[in-house]
């Protein structure tokens, strides 16, 4: 019964870490990354459609993304969606495809982005600590209901703490790696 608490905690921490990684792929660095466009939806015949569903998206150069729609009639809608997405990048439409040139980030902008990354990491640390609190509450309830012994409670609480520490360490590593990527010129 109590092993389930640890397994569930580990699963939820892993999901949180995956969520952090996903969120950070959308953070703009000095390089062109097609992941930044994942949240962009294009009005395709009245239906909000992911950009990848209406066009081919490529990063042929480190500071350029090209978007070639499968239907030329969608070009204006794609351009509109990109402008509304507030990516901080000005789309250039040449009638055939859209180019997204990524200008080099200024030192000040890189520091702002690094600060956002750090804030996002702190949010995920709080999430992991809340998961620990939930697991500990389940264990207390099990102890109170005599489903586990005092010794089991103490032992499992230590395992829960180790899982939490490991999760927070991973958050720190992910954030540090992303900050380094952002600060690279």
UniProtKB/Swiss-Prot annotation:
**SUPFAM superfamilies documented for this protein:** Ribosome recycling factor, RRF
CDD domains attached to this UniProt entry: RRF
Question: Which keywords label this protein?
Answer: Cytoplasm, Protein biosynthesis
Q: Which domain of life is it from?
A: Bacteria
What's a Pfam family in this record?
RRF
Coiled-coil boundaries: none
* GO terms for biological process, alphabetical: cytoplasmic translational termination
Chief subcellular location: cytoplasm
What GO cellular component is one of the record's annotations?
cytosol
- Kindly list the places in or outside the cell where this protein is found, as annotated in its UniProt entry: Cytoplasm
Cross-referenced InterPro entries = Ribosome_recyc_fac (IPR002661), Ribosome_recyc_fac_dom (IPR023584), RRF_sf (IPR036191)
Task: Extract one GO molecular function annotation from the record.
Answer: ribosomal large subunit binding
Q: What does this protein do?
A: Responsible for the release of ribosomes from messenger RNA at the termination of protein biosynthesis. May increase the efficiency of translation by recycling ribosomes from one round of translation to another.
HAMAP family registered for this protein in UniProt: RRF
The text of the family note is: Belongs to the RRF family.
Entries under PANTHER family matching the protein: MITOCHONDRIAL RIBOSOME RECYCLING FACTOR PSEUDO 1, RIBOSOME RECYCLING FACTOR
Q: What's this protein's name?
A: Ribosome-recycling factor
Q: Gene symbol?
A: frr
């Amino acid at each position: 019964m109590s092993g389930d608490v640890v397994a569930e905690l580990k699963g939820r921490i892993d999901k949180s870490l995956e969520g952090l990684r996903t969120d950070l792929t959308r953070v703009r660095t000095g390089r062109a990354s097609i992941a930044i466009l994942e949240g962009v939806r294009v009005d395709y015949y009245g239906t909000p459609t992911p950009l990848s569903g209406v066009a081919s998206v490529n990063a042929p150069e480190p500071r350029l993304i090209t978007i070639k729609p499968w239907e030329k009639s969608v070009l204006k809608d794609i351009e509109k969606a990109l402008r509304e997405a507030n990516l901080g990048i000005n789309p250039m439409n040449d009638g055939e495809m859209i180019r997204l040139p990524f200008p080099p980030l200024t030192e000040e902008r890189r520091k702002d982005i690094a600060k956002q990354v750090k804030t996002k990491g702190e949010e995920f640390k709080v999430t992991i600590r809340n998961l620990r609190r939930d697991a500990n509450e389940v264990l207390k309830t099990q102890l109170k209901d005599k489903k586990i012994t005092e010794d089991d409670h103490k032992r499992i609480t230590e395992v829960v703490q180790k899982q939490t520490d490991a999760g927070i360490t991973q958050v720190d590593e992910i954030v540090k790696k992303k900050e380094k990527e952002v600060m690279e010129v």
